[in-house]
Every structure is written in structure tokens, then in C-alpha cells.
Amino acid sequence: MNEQNLKRFNKLFPWFAGLSGDLLFWAAIDTLFLTVVKNFNTSQIVSLTSISLITCILLQIPLLNIIKKIGNTKSVRLGSLLLLISSILLTLGTDYIIVVIGKILYEVAFTFQNMINVVLKNNLELQNRENEYIKFRTNANTIYAIATMIISFVASFMFNINNYLPMIGCITFCFVCFVLSFNMIDY
């Protein structure tokens, strides 16, 4: 165990968990983006959510087997990578099926991404700080709430400047979180 690595994990965890809690810009403008940019109708948008959630539910056991096989650390990295790929597909996908695949990857990513909570718990136990779990989660939730609030405010202005600008922000945040995921190690 490297104490310096654990300290770095402790500092970065709230930022990683807070900024990767969702596709930040996507959450603020998803319906607007799908109707204005992708020209989807309401039934396509509703079916997009339904298909992705049903697929994710059906994949839960295979996904859990993959997590068990690759471990917590690689699961977090895979989740971050899938969020990045998802944001790219949702942004650049021109066909409905490509956007469906992007949305499925978005849902699946969170199954892997949620292993960050196990990593946090394990690392805090290693440091005899398990009673601070709520503090770390609260800090991450606060960062997520502030980021979401700010992004919700600016996303509409960005969308009015260029319809793709908020999604470029989304991809950028996903890339940063993917890079940060390499510091999210289950020691």
C-alpha cells in the first residue's frame, strides 16, 4: 500500500464521482438535442429510454460476471470509457440505431461506474477511515449538484450559440473523467 497513492485517491475521488455522476451537459438538454438536432419525435425519445433500460436490466447478470472477472478498478475505468463512447455516439450518431446503442452504453456504463463506491469503501477501510464514507460521498454529491446547476444554467446559452456546443462540453467532461479514472484504484 502506497500512502501517497491513497491520499491522491482521497483528493480526487469527490471530483471523479461528482463529475462522472451523469453525462452532465446531456442531462440538461437531452430532449431538446434529440428533437432539434436529431429530429426525433416523442415516441422515438420514449422508446430510446425504454429500450436502453430494458437492455440494461437484461444484461445485469452478465455485467456483474464481467465485474467479478475484471475487478473493481478496471470496472470503474471501463464505465468511464463507456460513458465517453456513449457521449460520442449520442452526439455524432446520425441514425436512430446508433443513438440507441449510445443510450444503451450510457446505461451499462453506470453499472460499471458504480463500482467506485466499493473502491472508496475498500480504500477507506485500508486507512481505518471507514466512518468517513458518508463525508466522501457527500462531497462528491455536492460537486455533482453544483456542476449540474451551473451546466443547466449555461447549457441553453451554449445550445443557442451552436446546437452541438453542450455535447462537446459533455464529451470533454467524459474524457477528463476517463483520465481521472486511472487514479481510481482499489488498493
For the regions a protein language model found, what residue spans apply to each?
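Paired small-residue
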Residues: 15, 97-106
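Symmetry-related core transmembrane helices of the 12-TM Major Facilitator Superfamily/SLC fold
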Residues: 165-183
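Transmembrane alpha-helix termini and helix-breaking/packing motifs in multi-pass membrane transporters
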Residues: 36, 68, 147-170
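Helix-to-loop junctions at the C-terminal end of transmembrane segments
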Residues: 59-71, 159
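Cytoplasmic helix-loop-helix junction between adjacent transmembrane helices
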Residues: 102-144
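Helix-loop boundary and gating motifs at the non-cytosolic
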Residues: 2-58
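C-terminal ends and interior cores of transmembrane alpha-helices
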Residues: 81-95, 99
